Structure formats: structure tokens, C-alpha cells
UniProtKB/Swiss-Prot annotation:
One Pfam family recorded for the sequence: Stress-antifung
UniProt similarity note: Belongs to the cysteine-rich repeat secretory protein family.
Signal peptide: 1-20
Source organism phylogeny: Eukaryota, Viridiplantae, Streptophyta, Embryophyta, Tracheophyta
Name of the gene: CRRSP55
Subcellular location: Secreted
Keyword Secreted: yes
Protein name: Cysteine-rich repeat secretory protein 55
GO cellular component: extracellular region; secretory vesicle
């Protein structure tokens, strides 16, 4: 698949109680000559039913679906963000399964990302393989003014070194989160997560690739999200992971523009 990076210039919402029905990104491999046959389509529906029913209990599921002779096999993965409830996970996966069939019609290589979950299926076996070939970057258009830029870089780097090292530990299931005070009145919040099919090494490599955008596309910005099929990293100047502090959230405001880049 051709590498595709999407960079969205976004004045981010001040609150993260995002509805699961609002997808962030979907990728349908329309460049591929592989389209879903009738049997593959049935296998996809069967696979999605399994992901919808099985993912919420543990927040993660991989599965396959094939016909009686093991031809036209489809591989699938679903994962919820590690800080959300089983109920929110279930809602998100249901929405993802429904929408991916609407936006990626007749495609046998598709993925969809929400703030709370990620779902993917393909006829190629992608399970356990690092994938940073396609991604999405969101960042706040406002620059950091509350702290010296060099100090901010150092604090941001230290926070993500900490939460990345936590996320790769098997007991944490790919999730790391934390915060640090930049000033008495400003707190930097960060979260990372990789898909739980990855090895510790591949998870760390995905994080390194994603966090690299903090010093380029997102440099000195007040918020940034870098999203790949294999991992997710984010920082904000407001609480966005659960449990939220309602006293520190605010209304959603913003302007969105985007540019698609390809090699």
C-alpha cells in the first residue's frame, strides 16, 4: 500500500468526552486491486460480529474468518483505548463495525479509527506486524506561550519517555498515561497506546516514530495527536483521558483544515 500521511491543522476541542459515533479517520485501500467477493464479504460480516461481541470484555480481540476450504480468509483486529469502560468500548466497536462497512464498501482491506477504539480487517495477515505506513496527525494551531520553548521540549520529552516505558510492559497492555506540571497553573497531559498484538520492540518503535512528530509537525504546539494503525500518542494542556476532571474541561471550539501528503 502506498504510504499516506494526513496532517490536520486543528484548534482542538477543550473537552475529550468524544462521542464514539464521531470517527477520526478511515482508510479504505481503494488503490488495491483486491475487492471483496461475495464470500469474502460474508466472511467480513462474520468477523465483525465476532469483534463486536468479544472485544469489550478485554478491550482487545484478533480473529479470522474463512469459508469451509479456508480460502478467502479475512483477518481482523479491534482494540479500545485502555482507559475507557467496557460499555463505552462496546458502543465504539459497534459504531466502528457499522460505519466501516458503509465507508469502505466492497473493500477487503479497511481500517477505521475513533477516539475510543480502532478496528481493522484485511485479507493479508497483518496481525503482529508493525504498521506505520499510513497515519493521521492532529495539532492545535496555537503555540505554547506559558513556558520557555526549550523547557517545554524537555518536559514533553521526559513525560513521554516515562509513559512509553510503562506502555511496553506486558502488564500495562500497551497503555501509558501521565501528567506533569509545567507551571503552578498549567499541566501537560499525555497518553500512548499500541495495539496489543505487537511485540515490546515493535511497540517501542511505533511510539518512537509517532513521538518524532512532536519535534516537527507539532513542535511548540499546545496539543498534538499522532495516529497510526499500530499506535497512538497524544498530549494536551487539558485533561483528556479518564478519569476526567470536570472542573478543568470546557466547551468545544475550533477550526479544521487538512492537507494530504504522499510520496
Amino acid at each position: 500500500m502506498k504510504t499516506l500521511v494526513v496532517k490536520c491543522f486543528l484548534l482542538l476541542a477543550l473537552v475529550c468526552s468524544c462521542r464514539a459515533a464521531d470517527s477520526i479517520w478511515q482508510l479504505c485501500n481503494t488503490n488495491s486491486n483486491i475487492s471483496a467477493s461475495s464470500q469474502v464479504s460474508k466472511n467480513i460480516d462474520s468477523l465483525l460480529a465476532t469483534l463486536v461481541s468479544k472485544t469489550p470484555s478485554k478491550g482487545f480481540k484478533t480473529t479470522t474468518s474463512s469459508s469451509y476450504n479456508n480460502k478467502e480468509k479475512v483477518y481482523g483486529l479491534a482494540q479500545c483505548r485502555g482507559d475507557i469502560s467496557n460499555t463505552d468500548c462496546s458502543t465504539c466497536i459497534q459504531d466502528a463495525a457499522k460505519k466501516i462497512r458503509e465507508v469502505c464498501q466492497n473493500q477487503s482491506d479497511s481500517r477505521i479509527l475513533y477516539d475510543f477504539c480502532f478496528l481493522r480487517y484485511s485479507q493479508e495477515n497483518f496481525i503482529g506486524k508493525l504498521d506505520t505506513g499510513a497515519g493521521l496527525i492532529y495539532f492545535n494551531v496555537a503555540n505554547v506561550t506559558e513556558i520557555d520553548p526549550k523547557k517545554f521540549d524537555n518536559e514533553l520529552g521526559a513525560l513521554f519517555d516515562k509513559i512509553r516505558s510503562e506502555a511496553v510492559l506486558p502488564k500495562n497492555k500497551g497503555l501509558g498515561k501521565g501528567k506533569t506540571k509545567l507551571t503552578p497553573f498549567v499541566t501537560l497531559n499525555g497518553l500512548v497506546q499500541c495495539t496489543r498484538d505487537l511485540s515490546e520492540l515493535d511497540c517501542a518503535q511505533c511510539f518512537a516514530t509517532a513521538v518524532g512528530s512532536f519535534m516537527t509537525t507539532c513542535h511548540n504546539k499546545k496539543g498534538c495527536r499522532v495516529l497510526y494503525s499500530s499506535c497512538y500518542v497524544r498530549y494536551e494542556f487539558y485533561p483528556f483521558y479518564f478519569p476526567l476532571d470536570p472542573a478543568k474541561t470546557g466547551p468545544s471550539v475550533g477550526r479544521i483544515s487538512s492537507v494530504h501528503l504522499s510520496p
